[in-house]
From Swiss-Prot:
Chain residues that bind Zn(2+): 12, 16, 19-20
A Gene Ontology biological process term: cognition
Residue intervals passing through the bilayer: 35-58
Keywords for this protein: Amyloid, Cell membrane, Cell projection, Coated pit, Copper, Cytoplasm, Cytoplasmic vesicle, Endosome, Membrane, Metal-binding, Nucleus, Secreted, Transmembrane, Transmembrane helix, Zinc
Family, similarity comment: Belongs to the APP family.
Signal sequence region: none
Record text on subunit structure and interactions: Binds, via its C-terminus, to the PID domain of several cytoplasmic proteins, including APBB family members, the APBA family, MAPK8IP1, SHC1 and NUMB and DAB1. Binding to DAB1 inhibits its serine phosphorylation. Interacts (via NPXY motif) with DAB2 (via PID domain); the interaction is impaired by tyrosine phosphorylation of the NPXY motif. Also interacts with GPCR-like protein BPP, APPBP1, IB1, KNS2 (via its TPR domains), APPBP2 (via BaSS) and DDB1. In vitro, it binds MAPT via the MT-binding domains. Associates with microtubules in the presence of ATP and in a kinesin-dependent manner.
Organism: Canis lupus familiaris
Protein known as: Amyloid-beta precursor protein
Free-text description of this protein's post-translational modifications in UniProt: Proteolytically processed under normal cellular conditions. Cleavage either by alpha-secretase, beta-secretase or theta-secretase leads to generation and extracellular release of soluble APP peptides, S-APP-alpha and S-APP-beta, and the retention of corresponding membrane-anchored C-terminal fragments, C80, C83 and C99. Subsequent processing of C80 and C83 by gamma-secretase yields P3 peptides. This is the major secretory pathway and is non-amyloidogenic.
Amino acid sequence: ISEVKMDAEFRHDSGYEVHHQKLVFFAEDVGSNKGAIIGLMVGGVVIATVIVITLVML
């Protein structure tokens, strides 16, 4: 039973690694200019979320 569990965990970890590598490759493929725009968009969303949470708490 323990062997099967370890095998399942190993598959999960390897799948995560592949997914992470795809994300890194995509980020490099997009290029610095679009990457900066995406970064600003993500940052804006985070800031907006923080503001909304702050207003809700008040």
